[in-house]
């Protein structure tokens, strides 16, 4: 890297809380750190929007918060994001719109407040109950 590219990379790693890891190899980083490096790499292209497909599903539970916090920060900065997630609490807090899918089809969509407090579809209600029960058990 040289000059502007290196400055940009370091700024993005700093934004991800990883400036001190800039010269580490991938195997020296945790799963959450690797995921944040991937986000920084994508941001280097200055996209208008980003797609996150289960960005936290392969992470240890204690690392999930790191990645969700970065995504929360991007949302607060106005980044357009399409997020596929089972992290319902996060979705309720961050989303402008929620789309519920079942078997590859959209079954319900709307503002988070409506979807999470008064879903129209029985399948959505069943899914949300299962997520809430799982959370209570842990």
Where are these regions (language model features)?
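Conserved ABC ATPase signature
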Residues: 25-29, 33
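A short, proline-enriched helix->beta-strand linker immediately N-terminal to the Walker B motif
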Residues: 44-48
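H-loop/switch region of ABC-family ATPase nucleotide-binding domains
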Residues: 85-86
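A short, surface-exposed alpha-helical micro-motif characterized by mixed small hydrophobic
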Residues: 91-93
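ABC ATPase "signature
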Residues: 109-110
């Amino acid at each position: 890297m040289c000059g502007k590219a290196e400055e940009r990379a370091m700024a993005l790693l700093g934004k991800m809380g990883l400036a001190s890891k800039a010269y580490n190899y991938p195997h020296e980083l945790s799963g959450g750190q690797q995921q944040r490096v991937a986000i920084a790499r994508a941001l280097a292209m200055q996209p208008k929007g980003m797609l996150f497909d289960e960005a936290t599903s392969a992470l240890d539970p204690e690392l999930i918060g790191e990645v969700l916090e970065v995504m929360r920060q991007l949302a607060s900065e106005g980044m357009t994001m399409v997020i596929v997630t089972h992290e319902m609490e996060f979705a309720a807090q961050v989303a402008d719109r929620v789309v519920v899918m079942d078997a590859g089809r959209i079954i319900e969509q709307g503002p988070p407040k409506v979807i999470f407090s008064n879903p129209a579809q029985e399948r959505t209600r069943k899914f949300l109950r299962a997520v809430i029960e799982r959370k209570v058990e842990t």
